[in-house]
């Protein structure tokens, strides 16, 4: 009889505990679902569609400039202009160059606004789209320069212009240079207007600060997306200044429509058709 016997063990699948753990707490990819900020429903991304509108409450999710371009412009019609203009750091603001570089790498944009020329249902127009994923689409010197150049190009070429606004206001890292863009862009809008040309602004969530106080409010026709936040100073600042409680819907697109600041509120899936119609109505047709 052997003094030592080989012990027998029951083999257990080493991955079993991991599998059981995953079954109890399955990992769901972050990009598969989205939570609506308004109704708090969890929505399957595919149900949002390319318009990114909540199917439960019609809340308009914030979208990038490239996503909006795909919704509004004719396919492959957009020709981007005035790229390669870089922001400087006039105040030597700590960390600003690094922030710009990181944001450019993350978004694939060179600045907070895309500018160029496109067609919408065959109607040619100059087009600018702000992108809130780029430092909250704050207006610095490059945003002001690109927009000014676009208005000058539209004036020379006798083109209408459409600007989609979305901004947290002036870019604090550029100080007074940023604030000067309000006057600069407004002057360019005025020259375009003096030439008898058509200008549409579409206010999207959020449009605030110096952008609201300048070119966003100067459109011949001002449209807005539903429930967009539109204003200059923040609600809390205003309440502390005037010492009054403001209405719940204060600074919402619907409030502004009721008080004459906005001409119409247009659903995102109807914007393309509405813009094409407005361009057609305001385009001169040469007599044949």
From Swiss-Prot:
Cofactors named for this entry: Zn(2+)
Main function: Component of the acetyl coenzyme A carboxylase (ACC) complex. Biotin carboxylase (BC) catalyzes the carboxylation of biotin on its carrier protein (BCCP) and then the CO(2) group is transferred by the transcarboxylase to acetyl-CoA to form malonyl-CoA.
A Pfam family assignment: Carboxyl_trans
Family statement drawn from the similarity comment of this UniProt entry: Belongs to the AccD/PCCB family.
EC number: 2.1.3.15
Record-linked InterPro entries: AcCoA_carboxyl_beta, Acetyl_CoA_COase_Trfase_b_su, ClpP/crotonase-like_dom_sf, COA_CT_N, Znf-ACC
Name of the gene this protein is made from: accD
NCBIfam families given in the database record: accD
Keyword terms, alphabetized: ATP-binding, Cytoplasm, Fatty acid biosynthesis, Fatty acid metabolism, Lipid biosynthesis, Lipid metabolism, Metal-binding, Nucleotide-binding, Transferase, Zinc, Zinc-finger
One Gene Ontology biological process: fatty acid biosynthetic process
Lineage, highest ranks first: Bacteria, Bacillati, Bacillota, Bacilli, Lactobacillales
Residue ranges of domain CoA carboxyltransferase N-terminal in the record: 32-288
Protein name, entry field: Acetyl-coenzyme A carboxylase carboxyl transferase subunit beta
GO cellular component, one term: acetyl-CoA carboxylase complex
Alphabetized HAMAP family for the sequence: AcetylCoA_CT_beta (MF_01395)
PROSITE patterns: COA_CT_NTER (PS50980)
Zinc finger (C4-type): 36-57
Subcellular localization(s) per the UniProt record: Cytoplasm
Native organism: Lactococcus lactis subsp. cremoris (strain SK11)
Transmembrane helix recorded as keyword: no
Record text on subunit structure and interactions: Acetyl-CoA carboxylase is a heterohexamer composed of biotin carboxyl carrier protein (AccB), biotin carboxylase (AccC) and two subunits each of ACCase subunit alpha (AccA) and ACCase subunit beta (AccD).
Molecular function GO terms recorded: acetyl-CoA carboxylase activity; ATP binding; carboxyl- or carbamoyltransferase activity; zinc ion binding
Residues holding Zn(2+): 36, 39, 54, 57
Reaction(s) this enzyme catalyzes, per UniProt: N(6)-carboxybiotinyl-L-lysyl-[protein] + acetyl-CoA = N(6)-biotinyl-L-lysyl-[protein] + malonyl-CoA
Cofactor note: Binds 1 zinc ion per subunit.
Signal peptide feature range: none
């Amino acid at each position: 009889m052997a003094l030592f016997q080989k012990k027998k063990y029951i083999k257990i699948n080493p991955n079993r505990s991991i599998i059981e753990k995953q079954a109890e707490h399955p990992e769901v990819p972050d990009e598969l679902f989205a939570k609506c900020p308004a109704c708090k429903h969890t929505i399957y991304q595919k149900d949002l569609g390319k318009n990114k509108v909540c199917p439960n409450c019609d809340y308009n999710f914030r979208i990038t400039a490239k996503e909006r371009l795909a919704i509004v412009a004719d396919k492959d019609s957009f020709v981007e202009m005035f790229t390669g203009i870089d922001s400087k750091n006039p105040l030597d603001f700590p960390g600003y160059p690094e922030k710009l570089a990181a944001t450019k790498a993350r978004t694939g944009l060179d600045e907070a606004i895309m500018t160029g020329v496109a067609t919408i249902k065959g109607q040619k127009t100059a087009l600018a789209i702000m992108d809130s994923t780029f430092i909250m689409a704050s207006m610095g010197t490059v945003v002001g320069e690109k927009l000014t150049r676009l208005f000058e190009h539209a004036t020379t070429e006798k083109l209408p212009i459409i600007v989609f606004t979305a901004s947290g206001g002036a870019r604090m890292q550029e100080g007074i240079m940023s604030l000067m863009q309000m006057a600069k862009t407004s002057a360019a809008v005025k020259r375009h207007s003096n030439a008898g040309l058509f200008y549409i602004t579409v206010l999207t969530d959020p449009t605030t600060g110096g952008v609201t106080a300048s070119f966003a409010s100067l459109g011949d026709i001002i449209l807005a997306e539903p429930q967009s936040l539109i204003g200059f100073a923040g609600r809390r600042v205003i309440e502390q200044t005037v010492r009054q409680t403001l209405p719940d819907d204060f600074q919402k697109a619907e409030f502004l429509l009721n008080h004459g600041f906005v001409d119409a509120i247009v659903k995102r899936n109807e914007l393309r058709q509405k813009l094409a119609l407005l361009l057609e109505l305001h385009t001169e047709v040469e007599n044949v």
